[in-house]
Amino acid sequence: MAQDASLSSFQESEWEVILPVLYRDRAVQNVEEERIRKLKTRLQQLRWRGAKRGGQEYAEKSCARCRRALGLLLNRGAVCQGCSHRVCSECRVFPGRTRVWRCTVCYEGRNVRIKTGEWFFEERAKKFPTEGRQETAGARLLQSYQELSKISVVPPTPPPLSESWCSSSPGRLQELSQPRGFNKSVENLFLSVTTHMKKLSKSQNDVTSDKQLLSTSPEQGTGRPERRSQSDTAINVTARKISAPDILQSLSPESPKRPANPVLKQENLLSHPTPGPLFSGGSRQGSLISINSACTEIGNFDNADVTGEVELALRYCFKTRSLEVCIKSCRNLAYGEERKKKCNPYVKTYLLPDRSSQGKRKTGVQKNTVDPTFQETLKYQVEPAQLATRRLQVSVWHLGTLARRVFLGEVIIPLASWDFGDSTTQAFRWHPLRAKAEKHEDSSSPNHGELTVRAKLVLPAGTSKLQEAQEGTGEEPSCDGQLCLVVLGAQNLPVRSDGTLNSFVKGCLTLPDKQKLRLKSPVLKKQACPQWKHSFVFNGVSPAQLRQSSLELTVWDQAAFGVSDRLLGEARLGSREDPAGGAGSGSHSKLQWQKVLSSPNLWTDMTLVLH
Amino acid sequence: MASATDSRYGQKESSDQNFDYMFKILIIGNSSVGKTSFLFRYADDSFTPAFVSTVGIDFKVKTIYRNDKRIKLQIWDTAGQERYRTITTAYYRGAMGFILMYDITNEESFNAVQDWSTQIKTYSWDNAQVLLVGNKCDMEDERVVSSERGRQLADHLGFEFFEASAKDNINVKQTFERLVDVICEKMSESLDTADPAVTGAKQGPQLTDQQAPPHQDCAC
Ligand SMILES: Nc1nc2c(ncn2[C@@H]2O[C@H](COP(=O)(O)OP(=O)(O)OP(=O)(O)O)[C@@H](O)[C@H]2O)c(=O)[nH]1
Ligand SMILES: [Mg+2]
Ligand SMILES: [Zn+2]
Ligand SMILES: [Zn+2]
C-alpha cells in the first residue's frame, strides 16, 4: 500500500511534533465529553421530574412535565407537537420569535442535540453507520500509537512497564478490538511505523540531530516553534483544564472587543460560572500570548535588565468572591529589545502557587512604549479563605516579533497579610519591579505539584476552649475530637508521557504513640489534574495528640497488576520537621496547620506543595 | 479509640465549559498556500513571512460569539504535504466544515482544488460545508488565478468563495464566520427535518437575518 510507505517513513522527530498535538486534542475532547455528560444528565433530570412517581396515580389531567393538575375548562393544557404530551402553560417554551412551542423536555432535547453535536453524529451516521460518536481520529491514532510504540518511543522516565500494563487493561483491549469504522489498515500502518521506529531509535544516529531541527523550543531562531500552536510543555496545561479546582474559578478577563450583548453575557457567566476556554479567551485578545506563555513558565524567554514600576490596586469583592487586580500603568520599563529601543509591554498575573493557565490573566499589549497605560482589571474568582494561601505574581513582559517574549520584571504580593476590608489598601500604588525571584526556590526543592486540601478539627461543644486543649496536661479534656481533611485535588503533578495519571491519595496520621492511622482515596483514572474531593476522617483524636502528630499526604500514580505504584509527591503537616521540605513552603504549611488546630470547627483551606 | 473513616465528599461540580457548542473545522489545500498563516491570523492576529511547513496536523481552539451563542471552534490545520495524507484524511470525518485553500499566485495549487474536493467527498459526511478560499490576494502583481476562475470553480463545486490574505488580514475573519454560519444553517436543517412539527416554522439558531459578508472577493 502506498500510504503504508508514507506513514512508516515518519521519523521519530516527526512524531515528536505530532504527538503533543494528539495529547492536546485529547484534553480538549475530555473537557467536551464532560460537558456533554452534564448536558445529558440535566435532560434526564428534567424527564424524571415529569415521570410517574411510585404509588402516585397517573392522573390523566395533569401536566406531563410538572405533574400539576389540569382543569377541565381553565388551564386545560395543550398538546406538545414534539411529544404529543399535554402540558400546562408554564411548561412551554417559545424558541426564537416564533409562535410554535415545545414542552420543556422537547425543547431541552433539541438543545442538547445542538449542544452535544448529536445532530452532526446523526447526520454522519447516514454515511458512516459504524462510526462511534466519541472516538476522534486523534484518539484512535493515539491509541494505536501508544499501544504499539511505548517501549521504543516514550522517554524512559516514567515506568514504561506499568504504562504498557495499564493500556492493555481489559477496557482498552475491548476498545481496540472494535475499531468502529476506523480504517483497519491505518492501525496496521501504525504497527509498521512503530516497528520501524524501534529500528530507528536503536540504530540511527541522526535521529538526535533531527530532533534538534524539530525541537519545539522557541529559543531556536527558526520559525517552527512559534508556529506550533502549543509547545510540548503545554500538554499539561491543557490537561489541567479538565478539572480546575472549583475554589479558583476564573472569570475570563473582560474583552471589550467581543460583540456580546451585555445581558446575555451576564447570563452565560451565571449559568456557566467558569473559566473561558483556555486557548481562546473568547476573542482576539492575545491568544498568541496564552499560547506561548507555557514556554515562558519554563524559562524559555529572554531577560531584560529590570527597571521601572507597575501601578496597581487590589480589591476583593466579597459579594462576588472575586479578587480584582486593577493594572493601571507602568513607568520607566526596560526596553524589551534594547538595541532597537523597542518595547511592547503587557502584564500577566498568577495567583501563586497556581501556575496553571487556568490561573493566568493578562492585559492587552501596548505598542512602542516604556510607560504604558493599561487601565485593565484582571479578576479571579477565589474564596476568601483561599486568599490567605495565595501570592499574587504580577509580571511585565515585552512581546517581540515572532512572538518572542522578554521578561521585564515582576512583583510578588503575598495576600496572607493583605487587609481587603481596609479602603486604604485598595488605592493604586506603585510597586517596583524586580528580577525573577523564584528561580532558586523551584530548583532547590523540586516541585512535584500542589495538593489542595481543606481541613477542620471537629470538637464536641464545650471542649473547644483552646487553652484546655493546648495544655494537654493532667486530665485529657477529651479524646473524641475528629480531624476532617478533604483532599480536593492536585495540579501540576508529574504526569505520564501520555499526559494523564491514575492517581490517588494516601493519608497517614502518625500519633505521638507511633500509632498510624491510614486512609486512602479512590483512584481517579486518566486525569492530569485529579479532583478527588474525598474526605479523610480521623476519629478519636484530641487536639493535644494532634499537636504532636504528623500527617503525611502522598499522591500516587496507580500501576496495574502488582507493579508498584509510583509516588508522585508528598506533603507533611504537623509537628515533625520535614527535613526534605523547602524552608519557605514548609513554614507556610506549618502555619496553616497550626491554624487548623487552633481554630476548631472551622475549615481551613491549604495548598500544599508536593515534594 | 482513634480510628479513621473514608467518605465521599460531595461538592458542587465545576463546569468549565463556557460555550454553547463546539464546531470542528478543517483547513486543507496544497502545501505553502497559507493554511497555517490563515489560522494564525485568525486565532492570534499574527503573521510571519517565514515558511515552516506543517508536520502532520495541528489545531487551535477559539471561542467566538455568534448569533447569541458562544461557539467553540476547534480548527485543524493540516499539512499540505503528500507524505502526511494518511494522518490528515483521518480527520475529515470529524469535521463539520472545511476551508479549502489555494494560492492565487500558484496555478498548481488551484488545479489541485478538484482533488481536494474529491477527498472531502470521500472521507467526510455528506453535508460537509466547504468554503473555497483563494489566499494571498495581497500579491496582485503575481496573481495567476483570476477571481473569476476562482468563483467559477467554486460555483461548479457548490462551495462558497472568498479571496483572502492572511498577510494583510483580508477576509480572514469573514471566512471563518461565514463557515460557522453555514454550519449553523445545516444544523438547523438537520434538526428541523428530524422534528417534522417545526418544518417550515424556523426556530433555534437560524441565520436568515444574517446579511452577506461585506465583500466576498478581494478588494485589492
Ligand atoms: N503575501 C502573502 N504571503 C502569505 C500569505 N499567507 C501565507 N503566506 C506565506 O506563504 C508561505 C506559506 O504559508 P503557510 O501558512 O506556512 O503554508 P501552509 O499552507 O500551512 O503549508 P503546509 O503547512 O506545508 O501545508 C509562508 O511563507 C507565508 O508567509 C498571504 O496572504 N500573503
Ligand atoms: Mg501549515
Ligand atoms: Zn407543567
Ligand atoms: Zn414535548
Curated annotation (Swiss-Prot), chain B:
Modification sites for Phosphothreonine: T86
Residue positions bearing lipid (S-geranylgeranyl cysteine): C218, C220
UniProt-recorded Gene Ontology molecular function terms: ATPase activator activity; ATPase binding; GDP-dissociation inhibitor binding; GTP binding; GTP-dependent protein binding; GTPase activity; myosin V binding; protein-macromolecule adaptor activity
Subcellular location: Cytoplasm, Cytosol; Lysosome; Cytoplasmic vesicle, Secretory vesicle; Cell projection, Axon
Positions carrying Phosphoserine: S188, S190
Motif (Switch 2): 80-96
Regulation: Regulated by guanine nucleotide exchange factors (GEFs) including RAB3IL1 and MADD which promote the exchange of bound GDP for free GTP. Regulated by GTPase activating proteins (GAPs) including RAB3GAP1 and TBC1D10B which increase the GTP hydrolysis activity. Inhibited by GDP dissociation inhibitors (GDIs) which prevent Rab-GDP dissociation. Interacts with MADD (via uDENN domain); the GTP-bound form is preferred for interaction.
Effect listed in the UniProt record for changing F51L: Disrupts the interaction with RAB3IP
Amino acids binding GTP: 31-37, 48-49, 53-54, 80, 135-136, 138, 166-167
Region called Disordered, residue ranges: 194-220
PANTHER family reported in the protein's UniProt record: LD44762P
Designated name of the protein: Ras-related protein Rab-3A
